[in-house]
Amino acid sequence: MDFNPVPPPRETLRAYLSKKGHVVKNWKLRLFVLKPGSSYMEYFVDETKEQQHLPQGRVPLYGTRVMEYVYNSNNNPREFCLSVETENKNWIISTGSKAQQLEWIEAIKHAIESAVETDEIKLQKHKSIEKQLQLDGKNKNKIPVLKLLLLGTGESGKSTVVKQMKILHHKGFSKEEEEFYRNLIYINLLDGMALLIHVIKENNIEIPQETLSAIKNYSSWYRVYIEKRNKNGIRNNPIGSMIPISILNNNKDNNNSNSSSLKNNSGGSSSSELDKKMTHLSLDGSTCINSNSASPNGPSSSTTTSTINTHNRSNSDGSSNNIFNVQDFGIPPIITNYISTIWSDPVVQSEVMLQAQKYHINESTQYYLNEIKRIGKPTYQPVNLDILKSRATTNGVVETDFNVNGEVIFRIVDVAGQRGERKKWINFFDDVTAIVFVAAINEYDQKLVEDNCTNRLHESLNLFDSICNDSTFPKTSIILFLNKIDLFREKLKRTSINICFPDYNGDQSYEKSSNYIKNNFLSKKKGGNGINSQNFIYFHFTCATDTKSFETVFNSVRDIIISKTLEFYC
C-alpha cells in the first residue's frame, strides 16, 4: 500500500507511544512530545509530568537519523516501529498504526534538518570521548594518530586551515616561519599593486595626474626589483609569482594621448639601463636626482647578503642597491608612499579593483594595501592575520602533525589542489581517517586560473562528487568546509549566485544563497535518499582566516572524527 508523504508539522506533535527498554518485552508507554524548531524530542510519564516539565528522557536530534524498524518476530514483537539512532545510542518506538508511524518518521526527519548541536550535547559528547579514550587499555601509553586528507581545488583555503592549526596547536609560528611569511607578504603586496597597474593600463582607465605620477615611479622601481628578485631565486621569491607582462615589457607603449592614462616612458631601455638611469632613491624616503651615480651593480653598491637583522632592517650603507633588497631592508619608505598614493585613489579602490577580479588578483591584496603604512615600516613583523592572509601556491604534498590536547595526533596531509597536482592524491588515500574538503563558495563568479574558462565553484562541485563517491573510501567520513563566507557575504551585495546556478530563483540573502550551495554539495553523495545519503558528510560554513570561529568549528570536527574512529582502538 502506498502512502503519501506527510508534510512537516507546524504545531507540536504529541502522542502516547511505546518505548522499548533493555529487554525485548520491556515496553513502556510514554507521552512523546516533538515541538517545531526543537533540537530534542522529549518523553514524559504522563500529562502531569509534561505540565511540570519533568521529562523522563530526551532524544537529541542533532546528527541523528530515523528510519522504519522492520517487524521481526525474533527481535521485535511489535509492528509499526521506528528507530531513532545517534552516535552512541538508539531508541526503538512503537506507534499505533502505519499512518502514525510515517507521520512521526517524517516529523522527526524535518526536525533533524533544523536541529542544532547544543552546549549540553557537546559537553556530553566530549566527556564520553575522553572517558572511552582513558578506558582504552591498548592506547593507555600511546596517542593514536589520525590521518586527515586535506583536499579541494586551488586557492580554496586549504593551506590557511593548516596555518590555523599551527596557531591553535603549535603555539603559533617560529621565528624562521615569521621571516618567511614576512617576505611572502611583501611579494603578495608588491605584485598585487603591479597587477592593479596592469589592469589600469590594459583597460585604459582614466586616473588623476597625482596617481599617474606615483604609478610611473612605482613601475620604474618595480621592473628593476623584479629582475633582481628573480635573479636571486627562491631565497627572495618563495612563490612562482605571475608578474603582469605590461609592467616588465618596456617596449610596449600605450598610444592613448590622454594625459590621465598610463603610459610607459622607458623608451625601450633594459632593466639594467633603467637601474642606472632611474632616480636614486634613498632608504630614508628622500629623493636625490643624480645622473652620475654609480651603478648598483658596481663595487660600491654590492647586494647585501649578510644575516637578516629583523630589528634594524633600515640600517643602510647608503647603497642604491638596498632600495631593491626588500627582503633584508623592507619596503623603502618612498615606495610605501607611492603605494599609499595609488591605493588612496577612489578609482583604484572601486573600478580598478573590480576589474582586477578578472585577472585572478590575490584575495588578500586589498587587505595588505589597507595595511600598507604598518607593513611598510622598517621594523615590520607580521601578525597572525597577516600570515593567514598570505598566499603561496602549494606544490606537491605537505604533512603536518598536531598534538591536540594530548588526546590524539592529527596528521594533516595538504595536497596541492591545482588540476596538474591531483594525480598525486591517490598515493595518500591509504589509512585515511577522514577527508577534509575545502570549497571556496565565494568563487561562484570566477574562472579557473588553469584554463580561464571553467567556473571555479563548478570545478569544486565536480571534484567533491568524484571524491565522496570514490570506492576507495566508501565509509570514510568527509568534513566539508564551505569556506570564505566573509568574502561570499560581500560579493552577494553586487552579484547573485544565479550567475553560477541559473536555476536558482531565490533572493540574494546570505542564508538562502549559502543554503542553496550547501545543498548542491550534499546532493553529490550517491547511494540513498534523504539523510541516509549523507551519513558520512559533515558540513561547516567557515572563514578560515578567523581564528576564533575556526577553533569552534575544529573542536566540533575533532569530536566527530574521534568518536567515529574509537571502534578501531577498542
Curated annotation (Swiss-Prot):
Chain spans, region G4 motif: 479-486
InterPro entries: Gprotein_alpha_su, GproteinA_insert, P-loop_NTPase, PH-like_dom_sf, PH_domain
SUPFAM superfamilies: P-loop containing nucleoside triphosphate hydrolases, PH domain-like, Transducin (alpha subunit), insertion domain
Sequence ranges assigned to domain PH in this UniProt record: 10-113
UniProt-annotated binding residues for Mg(2+): S159, T394
Region (G3 motif): 410-419
Segments of skewed composition (Low complexity): 254-272, 290-316
Ranges of residues in domain G-alpha: 144-570
Transmembrane region(s): none
Record region (G5 motif): 542-547
Metal-binding as UniProt keyword: yes
Recorded GO MF terms: cAMP-dependent protein kinase regulator activity; G protein-coupled receptor binding; G-protein beta/gamma-subunit complex binding; GTP binding; GTPase activity; metal ion binding
A GO BP entry: regulation of aggregation involved in sorocarp development
Region (G2 motif): 386-394
Binding site for GTP: 152-159, 388-394, 414-418, 483-486, 544
One Gene Ontology CC term in the entry: cytoplasm
Keyword field contains Nucleotide-binding: yes
Protein family: Belongs to the G-alpha family.
PANTHER family referenced in this protein's UniProt entry, alphabetically: GTP-BINDING PROTEIN ALPHA SUBUNIT, GUANINE NUCLEOTIDE-BINDING PROTEIN ALPHA-3 SUBUNIT
Assembly description: G proteins are composed of 3 units; alpha, beta and gamma. The alpha chain contains the guanine nucleotide binding site.
Purpose: Guanine nucleotide-binding proteins (G proteins) are involved as modulators or transducers in various transmembrane signaling systems. G alpha-3 plays a role in development. G alpha-3 mutants fail to aggregate.
Descriptive protein name: Guanine nucleotide-binding protein alpha-3 subunit
Underlying gene: gpaC
